[in-house]
A protein has these predicted regions:
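Short hydrophobic beta-strand motif reused across regulatory alpha/beta modules
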Residues: 27-33
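Short hydrophobic beta-strand segments in globular cytosolic domains
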Residues: 26-27, 156
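The conserved cystathionine-beta-synthase
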Residues: 1-14, 19-21, 36-39
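Structural beta-sheet core signal
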Residues: 51-53, 99, 150, 175-178
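N-terminal nucleotide-binding beta1-loop-alpha1 segment
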Residues: 34-68, 74
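Conserved N-terminal catalytic core of the sugar/cofactor nucleotidyltransferase
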Residues: 7, 42, 47, 79-156, ...
Length: 180
């Protein structure tokens, strides 16, 4: 199966491959690095760089599944999308996360608080009222005093965040945006 996926990804020059179940529904997204890597290598370049994950939205476009679970916990294969995003940052050494939560916040907190053996921390900021796409960042300014990443809880990109951090710092940029 690994060789088959690798061949298809090479043929189509793609960094990722969506896998569908028998009914044609998205079951998992496999990334190039997952196929070619024999072990998960964690560098510590970003060990002191926090990540803010925006997970407060209602996920209206994902209804009816988000009637039951928040979009941050929508599964892709074996893991919720927000955990996959966190794992991508952890591979670059990130150890500290802040999550902006609102809709079904208790489910997000319970899930992440019960992950066995996780090697990172998550502090939660709850919006008492919706503050917009990035409004809750203002609630975190007393906790974050250095360069940090911001990620939505529902967008996967295959990127080495260490490279992005080096680019950002080398150019003395105020803001660096990666979009998909």
């Amino acid at each position: 199966e690994r060789k088959f996926l690798l061949d298809i990804m090479l043929q189509n020059r793609t960094e990722f491959m969506p896998l569908l179940d028998d009914k044609g529904n998205l079951a998992e997204v496999i990334f190039w690095d997952e196929i070619v890597a024999h072990s998960v290598h964690i560098n510590n370049e970003l060990k002191d760089v926090p990540v803010v994950i925006m997970a407060g939205g209602k996920g209206s476009r994902l209804k009816p599944i988000t009637n039951i679970i928040p979009k941050a916990l929508v599964p892709l294969g074996e893991k919720p999308i927000m955990e996959i995003i966190a794992d991508q940052f952890v591979r670059c050494g990130v150890q500290q996360f802040f999550a902006s939560v609102n809709y079904k916040a208790d489910l997000i907190k319970k899930y992440f608080d019960e992950i066995p053996g996780k090697n990172y921390s998550i502090a939660y900021t709850s919006e008492n009222q919706p503050l917009g796409t990035i409004g809750s960042i203002s609630l975190m300014k007393k906790n974050i005093r250095s360069t940090f990443f911001v990620s939505n809880c529902d967008i996967l990109i295959d990127q080495d965040f260490s490279d992005v951090y080096r680019f950002h710092k080398a150019g003395s940029h105020e803001l660096t945006v990666i979009s998909a």
